[in-house]
Amino acid sequence: MYPTSHEHHLSIHENSELKNIKPQQKVLGCFLIVLSIAFSDVRDLFQIFSHIFLVFYILSLTKIPAKTYLKRLTLDIPFVLFALFLPFLSSENNDKIFEIFSFNVYQTGVNDMFTILFKATLGLTVGIILTGVTSSMEIIYGLQKLRIPNIIIAIMSFTIRYIDVFIDEFKRVKISMASRGYVEKGLKTLIPIAFASGALLIRGYERGERVYLSMISRGFNGNIDFKSRNYKVSNKFNFCVILSIVILLLYKIL
């Protein structure tokens, strides 16, 4: 696998059991788990606790530090804030449960709140698991092995590279502003940030164009090639994926 400077942004380089299994296996497995969570019914306690146990068991296999997990879980805050208002809303049915400070709490709103909290939190946790034990380029490699169209693979690969370009340019702009004595004080100091943002966009675009032209000069023809390496098999991860699908199928059949 080609090493890249952006691999460390999300991936946790630990001796995890899931670190060295095939990327396509991790991508497909996480997708199936998220699919099972998305189609599960929050009114079924067996499904809820089964999926919670499976997801957090897989999380324990990754050996991601709790502090890192909680920090990345903050992406769930907008969904949590949105879900907290749902109990006070109702669809067409006037299914009021009780009243709090002149605000009516409805059963449909409570159900929607638990649905969002359950699915969004577990879905994000699965995403944290995947990105924690798989580098960005390995994810693209796994998608390529899953026969995703080459145009999508190329777009994702360029996106990752250009994000890294913009991060580097942002660091340079920040250092240059600090060397010129820039200090953030009040709204007036936001004007230099606006100018710097425009310059950052232009410089990032120019650098991205140079990267693309250099790839063309080296024989790039639109196909992304990756070097494969030896991977291991995790029976525990495979069992959790299969069990997640079985739980969903049993609920749909029964």
Locations of the language-model features?
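Transmembrane alpha-helix interface motif
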Residues: 1-43, 53-62, 168-254
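Membrane-helix interface segments
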Residues: 44-45, 65-66, 148-152
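Hydrophobic transmembrane alpha-helix segments characteristic of membrane transport
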Residues: 50-57, 138-142
